[in-house]
Design a protein with these regions (language model features):
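Intrinsically disordered, low-structural-confidence terminal and linker regions
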Residues: 1-26
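A C-terminal-region feature
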Residues: 2-4, 35, 39, 385-388
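Basic- and aromatic-enriched surface patches that contact anionic nucleotides/nucleic acids
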Residues: 13, 26-54, 75-271, 345, ...
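Sequence-level preference for short, compositionally simple segments enriched
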Residues: 56-59
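C-terminal active-site subregion of NodB/CE4 polysaccharide deacetylases
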Residues: 66
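Short amphipathic alpha-helical segments and their helix-coil junctions
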Residues: 70, 74, 217-232, 298-316
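C-terminal subdomains that position terminal phosphate/3'-OH groups for nucleotidyl transfer/ligation
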Residues: 242-389
Length: 389
């Protein structure tokens, strides 16, 4: 995915998104024994490139990029290294300088998924091919004098062998059991090996790639949703919010009519939020238990209701996009729309206006937003506001 991993800042780019659950989760994550094993392995550059070409090493990507030949089930991350940085990396190998390890995850089909080291590996593959991903010739320029102007094809035999025979250390991780992917998620939340920050959703999209992730990507293009959220978010915050809405809609369905039942509440939602979202993706990865057509229609209808009721600022709370408010409002609306109980525009407008002035609700969407009581507090408040006579 990239050459670095760190926790997401609570305020994202573009329209600001307040997501207090990120900080809140830090005190809630189970730090017990992880469900994974790992070992070190050394791969020569030639072998890495061969495995990449044969797709035995998978570089996850978010949007199809057939020209680059690196698309795997819909995931693509923007190429974040400049041409100059790619050239410097190749130069480092040719000069025999040490480079950081890469991190690989063993997939069920025995392929390797790259979770740290994407840019290094794509650079090696590009240099071997002779072309940058944009189609321009990969020729070394701002490098040591004796390497200037060189391509892989024009390297002398000694330099070519030095490059291809260079060993790159890999940490190979094997998930163990049902908790394996969640352990990997937590592990990469602690990595910080380069200069590109990975967000939680970028990790999820790689670890849980498949029909549900691809379907959420399609929902992210809904016209009303785009009007409410704004420009497509380069770090997938819009994608993550849709996931949260879908997961919370399942919670609403489980507790409707039993809001005060502690057993129902414990069964429907357990913090931290990050693990709750991971579990939802794991459970519904293949979408077999979800009615995609009905959910898509309800999602679009819900976004359109908010847009008609309050315009493009309909999802904003106290002047900002607020993740906790969005997951509560849209999840309840989707649940009601699915059951043919959609409120009219005026009701939606009045409900949101009421919620924006409710001191308890403001607290539930602003503090400790991953905690169970606050999750159910905001969900029930929205449900009551939208269904009361």
């Amino acid at each position: 995915m990239s050459d670095n991993m760190a926790s997401v800042d609570e305020v994202e780019l573009g329209d600001e998104v307040l997501d207090e659950s990120i900080e809140d989760d830090e005190g809630l994550v189970d730090t017990g024994a992880s469900s994974l094993s790992y070992f070190g392995a050394d791969f020569d550059v030639s072998g890495l490139v061969r495995r990449l070409d044969q797709k035995d090493i998978v570089i996850p990507r978010f949007e199809p990029d057939e020209a680059a030949g690196l698309s795997v089930e819909g995931f693509q991350r923007q190429r974040v290294w400049t041409a100059s940085r790619m050239e410097k990396f190749v130069e480092s190998l040719l000069l025999g300088w040490p480079i950081p390890s890469i991190f690989l995850v063993v997939e069920p089909d025995q392929r390797y998924l790259v979770l740290d080291g994407q840019q290094r590996l794509t650079t090696l593959q590009a240099f071997h091919s002779g072309f940058f991903p944009d189609g321009k010739e990969f020729k070394l320029k701002d490098v040591a004098e004796h390497l200037q102007g060189a391509t892989y094809a024009t390297l002398n035999d000694e330099s070519r062998r030095r490059l291809d025979n260079t060993f790159i250390q890999a940490i190979v991780i094997e998930p163990q059991g049902e908790e394996g992917n969640d352990s990997i998620y937590r592990l990469f939340g602690r990595l910080n090996s380069g200069g590109v920050i990975l967000t939680p959703q970028e990790i999820r999209v790689a670890l849980y790639r498949g029909p549900l992730i691809n379907w959420i990507r399609d929902l992210n293009q809904d016209a009303a949703w785009r009007s409410l959220f704004g420009a497509v978010h380069r770090k997938l915050k819009d994608h993550e919010l849709i996931l949260r809405v879908l997961a919370m809609r399942q919670v609403v369905a489980e507790v409707d009519g039993h809001w005060d039942d502690p057993e129902k509440r414990r069964s429907a939602y357990s913090p931290p939020m990050s693990q709750f979202l991971n579990n939802f993706l794991q459970e519904h990865r293949d979408m077999k238990a979800l009615d995609a057509a009905a959910l898509k229609e309800a999602f679009s209808q819900s976004c359109s209701l908010v847009l008609r009721a309050l315009g493009q600022d309909g999802l904003k709370f106290l002047g900002r996009l607020n993740a906790a408010h969005i997951d509560a409002l849209l999840s309840v609306l989707i649940y009601l729309c699915e059951r043919g109980k959609a409120p009219d525009d005026a009701k939606v407008r009045d409900a949101i206006t009421q919620l924006r002035a409710d001191k308890k609700y403001i607290d539930w969407v602003s503090r400790s937003t991953s905690h169970r009581d606050n999750v159910f507090g905001r969900l029930e408040s929205v449900y009551t506001a939208l269904t009361s006579q």
